Amino acid sequence: FNTEFWQSPQAEAFFRSVPQGKLLILDLYCDVTPGWPKFENAFFGQPWIWCIIQNFGGQVSLHGGLDIMAADLRKAFEQRGKASGNMAGIGYAMEGLCYNPVIDEFQSDMIWRTSIPDTTEWLSGFVKRRYGKDSLKAREVWGKLHQTVYQQNQNHGNILQAQPSFTYKVTKPDKTFALIWKSFLDISDEVGKEKTYQFDIVNVTRHALGLLAPLYYGKLITAYLNKDRDALKAAYEKMDELINDIDRQLATNSEFLLGAWLERAKRWGHTQDEKKQYEWNARKIISVWAFDGELNDYAAKQWSGMMRDYYGRRWRHFYKSIDKSLADGTKWD
């Protein structure tokens, strides 16, 4: 909705103009801004679906408002026939799956429930199912994820995937998550052979390394502002090393490979021209998205191949251009 226009009178006129039961409403963004509490009997008695978007553009992220989801779902369940009106089901509006399986599974599980469980209790069962055994250490480390990244209902992205500029916020590395990453490594002796763990450790490592990016970015920008080319070079080399480290560790799991994405796209083609076209489309959608560039990086991917050969090259061009401006004594543009 355009919230400025769609006040209660406008919404009521719209929803009541359709016979009851002849309209099914998808409340798309209930994990962040649910629409159903804003109106009488949710959507004036029309059947509606409690949905989450959670992921835009299939971006690779580690986030999800697990407790926020549970709280709003619990409220909707308990107020059926009253404030939540004619809630008819639970749905998905994600633009990508895979990278936060705990959120996907929680949403799926709630479809079959008549009441919403305590998230801590539910998470213990999830960990056991995910790794095929009941590991206390695994449950503990997932509990730490629950209290950090899975309290965040929005993806804030990463500087490394952003178009280089001077405008990004500089933050200190998150030592808390570094300790979680270490704990995740420590459970490999119990669950390390499970493919689900092998996926998870790459995902968690990727996120932990990415949290170092603002540190090196800050040093890069400070060096430029101080017109210190030696410090600028040192900061860039650290940033480039980080990008390459992330790329190498992503290459250890097939779910994080640019090449796998491109090969799947080409398989849809029956001729060489079709294969080339599908590959071009696959490359375009994860980079510039469209022709006018207004959605650049909308579907940004932390994949091996993308980190080093796409994002890494962009930062290299940025470094060279700002270093040249210092060498020439000119303003960077």
Label each region the model flagged.
Residues 223-231, 325, 329:
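Secondary-structure edge/capping motif, primarily at the C-terminal ends of alpha-helices
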Residues 1-146, 151-155, 163-174, 226, ...:
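Catalytic-core regions of glycoside hydrolase
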Residues 215, 277-281, 314:
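Non-catalytic C-terminal accessory domains or segments of carbohydrate-active enzymes
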Residues 142-145, 181-184, 209-213, 217, ...:
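Short amphipathic alpha-helical coiled-coil/interface segments
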Residues 308-333:
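Extended, compositionally biased alpha-helical segments that mediate assembly or anchoring
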Residues 187-201, 249-264:
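Short, solvent-exposed, charged loop/turn and helix-capping segments
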Residues 103-111, 205, 209, 311, ...:
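Short, Φ-rich (hydrophobic/aromatic) sequence segments
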Residues 170-192, 202-225:
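C-terminal substrate/ligand-recognition segments
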